[in-house]
Amino acid sequence: MDRVKGKVAIVTGGANGIGEGTAKLLAKEGASVCIVDIDDENGKRVVKEIKAAKGEAMFEHADVSIEEEVKKAFAAFYQKYGKMHILVNNAGVGLGGGPAHKAKAEMFDKVFAVNVKGAWLCTKYAVPYILKTGPGSVVNVCSIYGIVASDVAFYDASKGALRAMTKSDAIVYARDKIRFNSIHPGNIETPLFRKLAQMVDKQGVGHAVHMLSVTNPLDRMGTPEDIAYGILYLASDESSYVNGTELVIDGGYISMPFAIYETNTVDWTTLNFYEKPT
């Protein structure tokens, strides 16, 4: 119960899904958790649930792609706790893009603004605080599609960029005792996944879950908690010699040839879903 006791951890996109699971686990293991999200209602709910379980947490609204909002939120966290050790860059968007000759520039810009620029901005404003109280750990939540390809080019490219940025930062900040690692989830059943499944699978969410389960070596989809435990390891001192690496948590999915199931023809040029699930 004390794997990150006494540490202060920021979790972006912490109001739902992987971020929520991570925030709750870090709090359970002794960290004071700072949640950043654009979803105020669920962000405050997660804080309330953490406190009800005798944990410590606070929430600040911020769009990670907007520098002033990130700066303000991180200053508020440091003002309250007076220290900072862990940053989990989890906030992200899933926007398709479609074939290059049909894709729209504004969609490309949105994906990279949140998935890449957002992680950079959070790192920019967390590092000075971590340097004061370190050592520290930054965990960037990427995707298996930052390693292998799908047909969602903008998303894949953004996660590949975040993976590369992680490695660069791992080198830059190693002597400052701040470790950087990336975590690469496979198919995880989250509110965001369910929203996408409703859009692309004519037979519904249940069918999508079933097909992604039977095409996985472990015969199931992942849960937010599966990823949260990986993040906990990378955030804790247990991984003090782990730096600049990728942790894939996908049930073995990318270790075998892909099994693709038929849904319908997806027009990725119009498909658009943001951080806040319905």
State what each model feature region is.
Residues 2-34:
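Canonical Rossmann dinucleotide-binding motif of NAD(H)/NADP(H)-dependent dehydrogenases/reductases
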Residues 97, 243-278:
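Short C-terminal tail/terminal secondary-structure segment
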Residues 98-100, 104-109, 212:
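Substrate-binding pocket helix/loop in short-chain dehydrogenase/reductase
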Residues 120, 218-249, 254:
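C-terminal substrate-recognition "lid" of short-chain dehydrogenase/reductases
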Residues 123, 158, 166:
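Active-site helix of classical SDR
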Residues 143:
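Residue(s) in the substrate-gating loop at a strand-loop-helix junction
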Residues 174, 179, 242-244:
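Short, small/polar-rich loop/turn modules that mediate ligand/substrate recognition or access, typified
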